[in-house]
Design a protein with these regions (language model features):
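Active-site-proximal beta-alpha loop/turn segments in soluble metabolic enzymes
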Residues: 35-37, 65-74, 104-107
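Conserved alpha-helical substructure of the radical SAM core
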Residues: 34-66, 80-84
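A short secondary-structure junction signal
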Residues: 26-30, 39-43, 151-152
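N-terminal [4Fe-4S]-dependent radical SAM core
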Residues: 1-16
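Local cysteine-cluster metal-coordination motifs and their immediate loop/turn environment
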Residues: 17-35
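Phosphate-binding glycine-rich loops and their immediate beta-loop-alpha structural context
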Residues: 28-31, 72, 81
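Conserved AdoMet/S-adenosylmethionine-binding subsite of the radical SAM
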Residues: 51-58, 74-174
Length: 174
């Protein structure tokens, strides 16, 4: 790809790594992105410019899906995450149908969606994405069913679903 902090591996999908999301809630032993977290600068890649993603997807009309990943993009404050997403929503091009956000926050810090200082701002951003006619998937990373059992996680799931976003889970087979 020609944009720092992005991989255009698949015809319709761009993986985007915002620089403020290059840390995580946990250090999972199976993570294949570990060089990004341990100070190996030559192996890191992250985007610092917020408008470049929009420019790139406008120039590549075959891109219909953006996966915002990291690290974990939900370690960022909502206003920083919105700086990447809102220009896409405001674009005159309508090629982006799906925005996915990969996160471990639902299992490790469900308060991100309920009681954090900017939790309501995050949920409002989710509503804004959905009301723009785009599909929003929160790609929740879980390692064990027990991570779904706490009241805090249940409340977070309810809050996310109320925005119109879908929650999809992914987990490594170990």
């Amino acid at each position: 790809s020609s944009l720092e902090g992005m991989q255009h591996k698949y015809k319709e999908t761009v993986l985007f790594f915002p620089s403020n999301g290059q840390t995580c809630h946990a250090y999972c032993t199976f993570c294949f992105r570990w060089p990004q977290f341990v100070g190996m600068d030559e192996l890191k890649f992250a985007a610092k410019q917020t408008k470049e993603l929009t420019t790139y997807v406008e120039e590549h009309s075959d891109v219909t899906d953006i996966l915002i990943t990291g690290g974990d993009p939900l370690v960022m404050q909502t206003r920083k995450l919105a700086n990447y997403i809102e220009p896409i929503l405001e674009s005159t091009r309508n090629n982006i149908n799906t925005i996915r956000i990969g996160t471990k926050a639902l299992g490790y810090w469900p308060y991100r969606f309920t009681t954090d200082e900017d939790a309501q701002d995050l949920l409002n951003l989710f509503r804004k994405i959905v009301s723009s006619g785009r599909h929003l998937s929160i790609m929740a990373h879980f390692n064990h069913p027990a991570e779904l059992e706490t009241d805090a996680v249940k409340q977070a799931i309810e809050a996310i679903r109320a925005t119109g976003a879908q929650i999809r889970t992914q987990s490594p087979l170990m």
